Regions:
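Basic, amphipathic juxtamembrane/active-site segments
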Residues: 4, 18-34
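Active-site phosphate-binding/coordination module
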Residues: 27-123
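A general structural motif
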Residues: 1-3, 37, 99, 148
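Short, basic/glycine-rich phosphate-binding loops at helix/coil junctions
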Residues: 7-9, 70-72, 142
Length: 164
């Protein structure tokens, strides 16, 4: 038998777009593929801390997280490449200049730029969700010790996105 590898996104692939549930048939198929010697990975834009336990409990061989900035295989952290402070500052300045809402994520924390009120409904939703779940949410994005794996922006118009 030739061993194969499969990668699954979380949102809308492993989960239902309607209610976020994971179909039992999906869990069975992943476990059966692993039992047959195939490698099963999650490949997600989420940082590892945002991969909920219900996904980990399915039993994957590894995870490609944070848009490829962090890779885990067989329980080991085999690759990690966060953004450096200079890059983060350039991104933060562009977000402030164009008035987009921005979220920086790392495998340890999530950080919104709160120098002005968040405006986009999805940014507000995620901010409240992270707060409700007790995430570490430092506010000093300009601290030289702050680092991030990835960022997300929310914009109100295509022109705003183009300017960013």
């Amino acid at each position: 038998m030739q061993r194969k590898i499969a990668f699954f996104d979380i949102d809308g692939t492993l989960t239902s777009e309607v209610d976020g549930s994971i179909p039992a048939s999906t869990i069975r198929a992943i476990r059966e593929a692993r039992a047959n010697g195939h490698l099963m990975f999650i490949n997600t834009g989420r940082c590892f801390q945002n991969v909920e336990q219900r996904f980990r409990d399915i039993g994957f061989d590894g995870y490609v997280c944070g848009c490829g900035t962090n890779i885990y295989c067989d329980g080991r952290d085999i690759f990690y490449h966060p953004q450096n402070h200079e890059t983060i500052m350039a991104i933060l300045n562009a977000a402030r200049k164009t008035n987009v809402d921005i979220l920086f994520e790392s495998r340890k924390e999530v950080c919104f730029d709160l120098t002005r009120p968040l405006r986009h409904p999805k940014a507000l939703y995620h901010y409240e969700e992270f707060k409700r779940q007790g995430y570490d949410m430092p506010e000093d994005l300009e601290n030289p010790n702050f680092f991030s794996d990835k960022f997300v922006i929310w914009y109100e118009s295509p022109m705003q996105l183009a300017a960013f």
